Amino acid sequence: RKIHAFGFTYKHGIFKPDEVLRLFPVNKVHWENKVHERPVCDLPKEKLAGYIEHYTYDSWQQWWDKAGHYTTIWAEDNFAKGKRTSLAACFAHSAYGFLRAYILQLGFIDGWSGLYSSLQHFIYTMMKYLKLYELQKVKINRLECYIQLDHLLNIVFQDQS
């Protein structure tokens, strides 16, 4: 599929043209991922001629709203699976995502649009990992509150004995 976003048609980088499984028997497929879900099918695949023109985002606000939703789902899902992160890892994953999109996937060849999409990918990745970091901090803070409450209750009830 060819991706169109923000008034640009992308040929490289994070929005480079990709292949998407579209026609399949529903009883022979299962779905992977909660964000950017995709069908997985073990049947032989055939590539059809031509492209699907995919018009994804018209504006920064539209992207921001969708990114906010997807990053929350990603963080909650990964937190439930036991994944943890640090602030340094948040930045490292984001920087790697930018470099992968802009340099390894040749986003720089698309000029301004390649830089734009690569920076957006940096922000998107940072949002994912910061939300994961936030979830683990909230859980740690709750645990500390429970421990302090338990300690306080022990003190109160020991004094009454």
Describe the residue ranges of each PLM region.
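Catalytic-site signature of metal-activated, phosphate-bearing donor transferases
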Residues: R1-K139, Y146-Q148, V156-Q158
